Amino acid sequence: MKIQSTIRSQARIALLACLFAAGCHAPGPVAPPADGVVLWIGEQRKAVHDGDVSAKVRLAELARRPHLYGIGPLEGLTGEITVVDGRATISTVQGSTFRTHASLDHGAAFFVWTHAADWKSVPLPNSVRTLEQLEAYLPEAARSAGLDDSAPMAFRVEGEVQSLAYHVLSPPEHTPPTFADHEKSKIRSSLAAQTVRMVGFHSTEHRGIFTPGASDVHVHFVTADERFAGHVEGFTLAPGATLLLGVPKR
């Protein structure tokens, strides 16, 4: 019964993601998506510009299926969500203090995710050390791994950063928040010489949907000790970092 319930749940979420993202319709039952396929629900631009910040999906529902990786803002734009292999790290700001805790008992205003057990390691050239350089390199990395570089892609970066700039959303001033509220609620910080795990998603076709309006990537991070997490704004990688690409099952 639990397996059947999980399958029904994943099918329902797949249908919701389809309806939100592609405007499609489903005349019959929807099968759970294959491992490694990137899905999303809600839209960044609607949350940020239109104040549509209600929960579009619950993390616990997505995590019923193993190997969940995903990122997005908390409902209400009150914090950040980073899920690494089913473990959700929630980052918030209380006063001037950054806080993190592990919990699946949250909803996301918009969310992009994959369920992936298979990841392909791709060497990072010495010339790829910053977020901008990684964004430019990802299509080439996908091709070298035999993946479709035109499809939305999940990726991870693991290793040490020499520096990393990030923000965490704090509760906005108004409900629903305005765009000005959203920008003001970004509490920025940075760290150095830390071992991190980053989860990101790349697409050339989804700016303002699950990537920011001026970028083809959306990336979050968690430090190895889980004390810090948030939305990545920039970084400089130390030598030896690893790039992993999610491999969709065919």
Q: Predicted segments — roles?
A:
Residues 25-37:
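Bacterial Sec signal peptide processing site at the extreme N-terminus
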Residues 94-142, 160, 175:
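Conserved mixed alpha/beta catalytic, RNA-binding, or beta-rich assembly cores of soluble enzyme
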Residues 127-131, 140-187:
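Mid-length scaffold segments of soluble, non-membrane domains
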Residues 51-109:
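N-terminal low-complexity or amphipathic/hydrophobic leaders
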Residues 172-223:
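Short, hydrophobic/π-rich interface segment
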Residues 220-250:
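C-terminal structured interaction module
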Residues 21-23:
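C-terminal motif of bacterial Sec signal peptides marking the signal peptidase cleavage site
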Residues 2-14:
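Bacterial N-terminal signal peptides that target proteins for export
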